């Protein structure tokens, strides 16, 4: 089945095999010593006999990834954002470093140094696969551990397909993912949120911030709302909001590659030759579709906003283009995410007295506030926030404000140091009696959760929601 031929100072192993299409082929591998050649001959014959022979293939990592992306995108119905981010990751963080390597030649000991290289790589070193000239300050801003972890996750999935395609026997990705150096997000407490809200004069921004603070809505979910999603008479007159869509700006190339059923509507371009489009799409996950309850002040603001939109249309009906969205510009066109972000940044620059947080930080602040108010009712708060799992919510809650911890310290101080220890006797060993059950309060559980690390919180979630 295989033979060895001496050629000069080397030894060649020759064998016959069939490629993936069943076509007969000849294999030829060269070794420095006869012992190596004999060992390879035995291995090849065994693999050909039991059907585990790996057909030689010259496919590179770059070729494999660009073959995998459309398959994965179609199979898992990627959103335009996920498609764009994945392509950018391949173009800028993988191909420039290991893209030309053959898939069959790559080993785990090649991937580890690759991760180390990325950890010392500046952000934006490559854009669309082209190396960029960076300033000295730009060179100091290195890729985050989160970005490197995302590269690992993508490669792990892609190489699992390579195994299924019989390109390789096992994935070269390391078993242990690169560690993520998590930093606590900056959030506001309830007093700061209310104080900040009271300083916002832009009506559209005020309403959007109000909804994010009270309902923990994502930016795209807020802008994706339509008047028909509001039911002011529901819940005995309290009013409800149905969240089932999201507004997003998406790359046109990505839109042409993904499942079109994910997109409900594509808005007309405002600029000729634009490379992106404003779209109305499905929400992030199934759990993101939810019914939320209005507070009385929010209900009043929503009614006032609807009245304002009517006035805008009546003031200039010939120039008004009703886009159908709840959040509109005075001309009726939709408020895009980048516009809302611009307004928020302008307001933030005018009010440096508030600790700097991004718009999405309002959602995290809201989730933390709701958990504190509910006494740690994770399921109820998860229903409000639309987090995919309670684990994600727990990780958000892990950085809760210092106030409860400070209050706990004050209680310990008041109790511990005020004890009367005069004449106190040494504690006697406990008798072998059944211990009296201790009443565990919600606050005790919350404090225990705050002290947990990420792994302990994930295990707790698995037990609670299995």
Q: Where on the chain are the PLM-derived regions?
A:
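N-terminal DNA-binding recognition helix of tyrosine site-specific recombinases/integrases
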Residues: 1, 89, 93, 101-109, ...
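N-terminal DNA-binding module of tyrosine recombinases/phage integrases
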Residues: 7-12, 17-112, 128, 307-322, ...
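Flexible interdomain linker/hinge and immediately adjacent N-terminus
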Residues: 113-114, 163-197, 330-331
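Short, basic (Lys/Arg/His-rich) helix/loop patches that form interaction surfaces
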Residues: 124-127, 198, 202-205, 215, ...
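Long, amphipathic, Lys/Arg-enriched alpha-helical "connector/arm" segment
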Residues: 128-134, 179-205, 214-217, 225, ...
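Catalytic-site neighborhood detector that most strongly recognizes the C-terminal catalytic loop/helix
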Residues: 179-180, 187, 238, 245-249, ...
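Short, polar N-cap/turn motifs at the start of nucleic acid-interacting alpha helices
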Residues: 229-237, 375-398, 425
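C-terminal secondary-structure termini that scaffold catalytic or DNA-interacting sites
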Residues: 233-235, 245-289, 298, 410-466
């Amino acid at each position: 089945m295989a033979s060895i031929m001496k050629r000069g100072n080397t030894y060649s192993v020759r064998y016959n095999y069939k490629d993936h299409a069943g076509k007969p082929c000849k294999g030829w591998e060269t070794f420095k010593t006869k012992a190596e050649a004999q060992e390879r001959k035995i291995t090849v014959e065994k693999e050909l006999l039991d059907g585990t022979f790996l057909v030689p293939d010259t496919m590179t990592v770059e070729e494999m990834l660009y073959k995998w992306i459309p398959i994965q995108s179609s199979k898992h119905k990627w959103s335009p954002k996920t498609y764009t981010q994945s392509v950018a990751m391949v173009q800028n963080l993988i191909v420039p470093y290991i893209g030309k390597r053959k898939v069959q030649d790559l080993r785990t000991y090649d991937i580890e140094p690759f991760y180390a290289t990325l950890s010392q790589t500046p952000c934006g070193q490559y854009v669309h696969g082209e190396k960029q000239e960076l300033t000295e300050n730009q060179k100091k801003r290195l890729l985050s551990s989160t970005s490197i972890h995302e590269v690992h996750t993508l490669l792990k999935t892609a190489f699992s397909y390579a195994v299924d395609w019989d390109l390789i026997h096992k994935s070269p990705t390391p078993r242990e993912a690169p560690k993520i150096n998590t930093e606590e997000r900056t959030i506001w407490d309830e007093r700061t949120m209310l104080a900040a809200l009271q300083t916002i004069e832009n009506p559209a921004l005020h309403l959007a911030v109000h909804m994010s603070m009270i309902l923990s809505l994502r930016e795209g979910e807020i802008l994706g709302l339509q008047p028909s999603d509001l039911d002011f008479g529901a819940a005995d007159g309290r009013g409800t909001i149905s969240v089932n869509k999201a507004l997003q700006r998406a790359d046109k190339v990505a839109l042409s590659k993904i499942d079109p059923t994910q997109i409900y509507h594509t808005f007309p371009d405002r600029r000729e030759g634009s490379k992106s489009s404003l779209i109305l799409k499905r929400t992030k996950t199934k759990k993101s579709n939810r019914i939320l309850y209005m507070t009385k002040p929010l209900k009043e603001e929503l009614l006032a906003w609807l009245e304002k939109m009517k006035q805008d249309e009546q003031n200039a009906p010939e120039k008004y283009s009703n886009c159908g969205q709840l959040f509109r510009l005075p001309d009726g066109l939709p408020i895009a995410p980048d516009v809302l972000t611009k307004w928020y940044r302008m307001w933030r620059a005018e009010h440096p007295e508030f600790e700097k947080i991004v718009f999405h930080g309002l959602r995290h602040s809201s989730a933390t506030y709701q958990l504190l108010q509910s006494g740690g009712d994770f399921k109820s708060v998860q229903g409000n926030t639309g987090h995919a799992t309670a684990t994600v919510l727990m990780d958000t809650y892990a950085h809760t404000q210092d106030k409860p911890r400070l209050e706990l310290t004050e209680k310990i101080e008041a109790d511990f140091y005020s004890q009367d220890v005069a004449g106190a006797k040494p504690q006697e060993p406990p008798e072998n009696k059944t211990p009296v059950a201790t009443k565990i309060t919600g606050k005790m559980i919350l404090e225990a959760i705050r002290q947990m690390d990420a792994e302990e919180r994930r295990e707790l979630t698995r037990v609670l929601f299995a």
